């Protein structure tokens, strides 16, 4: 027979079962009728055993705890002479159990509240961010100064990324291209954009390593001639190439 830990009526453990029994009796959790609760709990465990279900050990531990508390409460009170100067309140055998039940109840209520909030949140849908670059003319955010080291770092990262994505077998064909030709190509790409602006790596798509180097040198020359500028909105953010001058009008 396949063994299984029972989970009747979605009880997650002995404390969950006890809360259910206390709720059925409609009694105060701070004044649990131990005899009645223990009898009902033991009846539940015995029923599971009769059905030949594998009762989880934690249920058996709780059964022993309940029987111990019940026994203590059934013991006759000893009649002693009372010294009112040293009188202390007698500890209730149920105190530790009540404390555990209250703590479990708080966690259960918190879990229920979180689940409700999760269900409520599922009705909300986030809208993907929009590219508003073409609308930001006149409200341009201050850019950080981009150094040659920043550009070299971005260029090296792009080279490594393209090397990882390179096919295992490639046929190399030489194609000479001048820096002037590549400068015109870069300006042409920028001219095609509404705001004359492109992300740095978009200028280097589908090029050989030699072409990448020529494009990078062309970009530096365009910056020197003040035909383009390279911008960065924040440290470690993407670099953007912004066209300038009459060539783009």
UniProtKB/Swiss-Prot annotation:
Gene Ontology biological-process entries: cell division; chromosome segregation; DNA replication
Entry GO terms, CC: cytoplasm
Recorded family membership: Belongs to the ScpA family.
SUBUNIT field: Component of a cohesin-like complex composed of ScpA, ScpB and the Smc homodimer, in which ScpA and ScpB bind to the head domain of Smc. The presence of the three proteins is required for the association of the complex with DNA.
Chief location bin: cytoplasm
Pfam families (UniProt xref): SMC_ScpA
Localization per Swiss-Prot or TrEMBL: Cytoplasm
Organism name: Listeria innocua serovar 6a (strain ATCC BAA-680 / CLIP 11262)
Keyword presence, Phosphoprotein: no
Keywords per UniProt: Cell cycle, Cell division, Chromosome partition, Cytoplasm
InterPro entries, A to Z: ScpA (IPR003768), ScpA-like_C (IPR023093)
Entry annotated with the keyword Chloroplast: no
The name this protein goes by in its record: Segregation and condensation protein A
């Amino acid at each position: 027979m396949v063994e299984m830990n029972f989970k009747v009526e979605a009880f997650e453990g002995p404390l969950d079962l006890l809360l259910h029994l206390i709720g059925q009796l409609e009694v105060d959790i701070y004044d649990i009728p131990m005899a009645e609760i223990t009898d009902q709990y033991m009846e539940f465990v015995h029923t599971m055993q009769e059905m030949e279900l594998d009762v989880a050990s934690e249920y058996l531990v709780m059964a022993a705890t309940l029987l111990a508390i019940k026994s203590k409460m059934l013991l006759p009170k000893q009649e002693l002479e009372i010294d009112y100067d040293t009188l202390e309140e007698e500890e209730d055998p149920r105190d530790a159990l009540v404390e555990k039940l209250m703590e479990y109840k708080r966690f259960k209520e918190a879990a229920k509240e979180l689940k409700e909030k999760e269900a409520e949140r599922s009705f909300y849908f986030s809208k993907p961010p929009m590219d508003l670059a073409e609308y930001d003319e006149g409200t341009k955010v201050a850019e950080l100064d981009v150094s040659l080291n920043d550009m070299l770092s971005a260029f090296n990262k792009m080279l490594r990324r393209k090397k990882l994505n390179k096919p295992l077998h490639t046929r190399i064909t030489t194609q000479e291209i001048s820096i002037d030709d590549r400068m015109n190509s870069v300006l042409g790409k920028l001219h095609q954009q509404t705001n004359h602006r492109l992300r740095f790596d978009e200028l280097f798509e589908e090029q050989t390593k030699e072409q990448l180097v020529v494009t990078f040198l062309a970009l530096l020359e365009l910056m020197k001639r003040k035909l383009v500028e390279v911008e960065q909105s924040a440290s470690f953010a993407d670099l953007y190439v912004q066209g300038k001058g009459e060539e783009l009008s």
